[in-house]
Amino acid sequence: MDSQRPEPREEEEEEQELRWMELDSEEALGTRTEGPSVVQGWGHLLQAVWRGPAGLVTQLLRQGASVEERDHAGRTPLHLAVLRGHAPLVRLLLQRGAPVGAVDRAGRTALHEAAWHGHSRVAELLLQRGASAAARSGTGLTPLHWAAALGHTLLAARLLEAPGPGPAAAEAEDARGWTAAHWAAAGGRLAVLELLAAGGAGLDGALLVAAAAGRGAALRFLLARGARVDARDGAGATALGLAAALGRSQDIEVLLGHGADPGIRDRHGRSALHRAAARGHLLAVQLLVTQGAEVDARDTLGLTPLHHASREGHVEVAGCLLDRGAQVDATGWLRKTPLHLAAERGHGPTVGLLLSRGASPTLRTQWAEVAQMPEGDLPQALPELGGGEKECEGIESTG
């Protein structure tokens, strides 16, 4: 007689598994590193797809479980199978009629999920079943946008080959006007940028994003591939202005080396020097003035870079600008001088510097106000802060 304990029947295994999931699914799923961990209200099929026993999923489908079941976020069993990268389950659900184009509450399809997680094999199954590579989420994002943002190069290449949009997918814009190249630049995804550039994608906007995100390698790559160095964003800023605002001195050097014009103004009249001075980026200011940036350029409010540096209390930057000949008593909006702006913000050291460089404490604004500190009288001039010749000495390229 066989002394071995008989194996439970398949039906019993599946029934035990389902009962376990009903009682303890939240604890079990909460140990996973991605995807949903709170499954209150999930039906049996959604739980089985996420838990993963293919035999149980098959049994539930035979018992009439709906492939169009939804969770709280509007995701179908197909969404969850794709999120897990579980190709056999994806194939099974598709064979049982799961709608390949179903969208969740955010407008995302299963192909969006595959693109986000880089599941190339699963994406291929979806595309073979007619998934649209041109599908857009609620914010206008296509699967290609997501693949580009996350650096899934092989998947991005497959999406560009998909029927429908084809190469034109590279120029599709989301709700903010970004293309796949913008998203790749934001993440510094050089391989994806190479793929897109080889297909003729526009790169000017991507250059601006690379500068704004501080992605130096992407910025250099895009310049080498022909992106226009003085392209402008919707606010009129160039890559040089965006890099200056971040104080990215190496990027500034690269852009200047490619012929970037430091005199270009944005729609508020601000030059790259205005932006660097306002943020207190001394090295960026030094680079720009050494390359001929206009030290007394005025924005639409009549403010010079010295006004901006003084208002924010950037005393070293103010000293550098004064060393380069900035007008200490330049008047701007409401006839305010740099001294007025530094004083009303309570920047004592900057006030002392300006006074030591000859700023007049008697000049009055449009409202006949002289410069005054919040606590009362102006501090004395601080001559020791006024020498400052070293602040704006010529800068050697750090190339």
Curated annotation (Swiss-Prot):
<feature type="repeat" description="ANK 10">
    <location>
        <begin position="334"/>
        <end position="363"/>
    </location>
</feature>
<feature type="repeat" description="ANK 7">
    <location>
        <begin position="235"/>
        <end position="264"/>
    </location>
</feature>
<feature type="region of interest" description="Disordered">
    <location>
        <begin position="377"/>
        <end position="399"/>
    </location>
</feature>
<feature type="repeat" description="ANK 2">
    <location>
        <begin position="73"/>
        <end position="102"/>
    </location>
</feature>
<dbReference type="Pfam" id="PF12796">
    <property type="entry name" value="Ank_2"/>
</dbReference>
<protein>
    <recommendedName>
        <fullName>Ankyrin repeat domain-containing protein 65</fullName>
    </recommendedName>
</protein>
<feature type="repeat" description="ANK 6">
    <location>
        <begin position="207"/>
        <end position="231"/>
    </location>
</feature>
<dbReference type="InterPro" id="IPR050889">
    <property type="entry name" value="Dendritic_Spine_Reg/Scaffold"/>
</dbReference>
<dbReference type="InterPro" id="IPR002110">
    <property type="entry name" value="Ankyrin_rpt"/>
</dbReference>
<feature type="repeat" description="ANK 8">
    <location>
        <begin position="268"/>
        <end position="297"/>
    </location>
</feature>
<feature type="repeat" description="ANK 9">
    <location>
        <begin position="301"/>
        <end position="330"/>
    </location>
</feature>
<feature type="repeat" description="ANK 3">
    <location>
        <begin position="106"/>
        <end position="135"/>
    </location>
</feature>
<keyword id="KW-0677">Repeat</keyword>
<keyword id="KW-0040">ANK repeat</keyword>
<dbReference type="InterPro" id="IPR036770">
    <property type="entry name" value="Ankyrin_rpt-contain_sf"/>
</dbReference>
<feature type="repeat" description="ANK 4">
    <location>
        <begin position="139"/>
        <end position="168"/>
    </location>
</feature>
<feature type="repeat" description="ANK 5">
    <location>
        <begin position="176"/>
        <end position="205"/>
    </location>
</feature>
<feature type="repeat" description="ANK 1">
    <location>
        <begin position="40"/>
        <end position="69"/>
    </location>
</feature>
